Amino acid sequence: MGDRFIPIRNVSNEFNFSFQSFKECVLSHGSNLRRKTSGTIQRQFMELLSMELFGSQASRSRAFYYGEDKRKIEKKMLDTPDRKSYSLSPISPQSQDMLRQPQKPKRAFPKTPYKILDAPYLKNDFYLNLLDWGQSNVLAVGLASSIYLWSAASGKVVQLHDFGATNHVTSVLWTGKGTQLAVGTDSGVIYIWDIESTKSVRSLKGHSERVAALAWNDNTLTSGGKDEVILHHDLRAPGCCAEMMKVHEQEICGLQWDRSLGQLASGGNDNNLFVWDYRSSRPLHKFEEHTAAVKAIGWSPHQRGILASGGGTIDRCLTIHNTLTGRLQNKLDTGSQVCNMAWSKTSNEIVTTHGFAKNQVSLWKYPSLKNIANLTAHTNRVLYLSMSPDGQSIVTGAGDETLRFWKLFNKKPKEESTLIR
């Protein structure tokens, strides 16, 4: 008769199951727990359970030990009030320490806008740009043939001008300092308004059809029209325009300057996205990934040469290009028409506005393009978007003739001075 091996079993722990085995058991049979707890909550629960059942060092070895248990065992010591035996808490001191650790608060997103303004006669036209929030904290909006200004500080609304029934506003854009406003019209003429005097100080001609896109670069105003032409207007010169460029084959609906690089991005109804260097009249890059009109364009304020763009109804994609290398960095199907976009000034995130079917405002993490939040309140496609000067809020305008204000971002922390006082 042969010898039989009998494993050594600790009296206080007859079977030493590893925490990993226990965890698999809980996850396979605890379907109700999974439904009620998710993500961070479930992970914290499993960590607490591990601490209580197996101590601070949960074993991940095999399920049974054949031999001496080498895990740390509480050493015999003199009886003191600090002993676990005398604790009034149902959990161990180690678990208490874990629960006392500060938790990062979960980011909350608004379910509803904090302000809604009526915008009668706000055009439901994908190609126009009728909304801009300037550095002076004044919002400019084009409603039919009129320009209105809304002060975020006082809440006061004033009508700046009415062009008459035959000439509607097609685009508005503040200068960098917010002291002058450029207004594009159906007639192809661009008007420059001085806000302090509330007078038009200049009119710029050159387009034969409506001007839907505007972009400032210091003293130069770039405009794009339905005539497929891009014009650079140097406001320091008495003449009309300094340069004309024509490569788009349909209406130009998106323009954005990256002032740090001196690069201009232009998008059009021909589904093309061009990047220009300010020193050349020929495009630096031509990106053809989109299959619908490219109106939504935005340069990253955090990384040089990173350009985001969004396509229309057929395309629905959000793309990221690196204009320093000329390569496509990322592409994502958002599921609906991308009408407009803006980069957060305080975090590496992108806000996009959308059309059918949800008419939502979406927030994406860069560079993964992971969807962070979706805000739904508009009842028609969200065509217009602008960000507040402090970067905390956005305003959206839609075909439902409303302007809605959302607080999405925290204020940018002040950089500590390195000067020795």
UniProtKB/Swiss-Prot annotation:
SUPFAM superfamilies: WD40 repeat-like (SSF50978). WD repeats lie at residues 123-160, 164-203, 206-246, 247-286, 289-331, 333-374, 377-416. Signal peptide: none annotated. Residues 79-107 are annotated as: Disordered. It is found in: Nucleus. Gene3D superfamilies: YVTN repeat-like/Quinoprotein amine dehydrogenase. Its main location: nucleus. One of its GO terms (molecular function) is anaphase-promoting complex binding. GO terms for biological process: anaphase-promoting complex-dependent catabolic process; metaphase/anaphase transition of meiosis II; positive regulation of anaphase-promoting complex-dependent catabolic process; positive regulation of ascospore formation; positive regulation of meiotic cell cycle; sporulation resulting in formation of a cellular spore. Keywords: Meiosis, Nucleus, Repeat, Sporulation, WD repeat. Pfam families: WD40_CDC20-Fz. GO terms for cellular component: anaphase-promoting complex. Residues 86-98 have a biased composition (Polar residues). Interacts with mes1. Meiosis-specific activator of the anaphase promoting complex/cyclosome (APC/C). Involved in cdc13 degradation. Belongs to the WD repeat CDC20/Fizzy family. This is Meiotic fizzy-related protein 1. The lineage of its organism: Eukaryota, Fungi, Dikarya, Ascomycota, Taphrinomycotina.
